[in-house]
Amino acid sequence: MAVTPWQTAFLQLLPSGLAWNKSPDSKLSALAQAISDVIATAADDARQMLRERFPSTSRWYLGEWESFLGLPDCTSENGTLSERQRAAANKMRMTGNLSRRFYEWLAAQYGFTVRLTDSTEGQWVTQVNIYGIKNYRNATVLDNVLTPLRVYESGALECLLEKYKPAHQIYKFVYHDGDN
């Protein structure tokens, strides 16, 4: 029978003498083994509780972290544990602002190339030029008359930018086939 570190520590705390048989095959050693298993589990739980302070290492309270950070959002649904931890850690570290560079950077973090420009439609309208999108389908006869001639599949990008934009701002999304 292998002697664990917690079992050894427990046996060393007991007094010496003939009444205290500390040999590995004694009943006292078996009792110390049972107690040390519980203490080892509690020590592991205490170490994990220290890791729960940060979303990148959280397992038990990851749901609470996600709720606090507003996750899952339109870009991070149904991920693995490590993907969810990474998304929560990135959201925790993110410091946003209202500049155009921030929105271009945010789109680049998700693999999109965009450029924001002023629109001629008014002060509160911004044109979001999206480059290099290859996920689209052409309209068919089964679509209704309100369907555009090309239907683009970048709903995650539009959802993401709409979530972080100021409430008074209107985004007009324009898709370009080539690079900028």
Curated annotation (Swiss-Prot):
Disruption phenotype: No tail is synthesized. Signal peptide: none annotated. This is Baseplate protein gp48. Keywords: Host cytoplasm, Late protein, Viral baseplate protein, Viral release from host cell, Viral tail assembly, Viral tail protein, Virion. Part of a complex composed of three DNA circularization protein N, three baseplate hub protein gp44 and three sub-complex wedge (made of two copies of each baseplate protein gp46, gp47 and gp48) that forms the baseplate. Component of the baseplate. Its main location: virion. It comes from the Viruses. One of its GO terms (cellular component) is virus tail, baseplate.
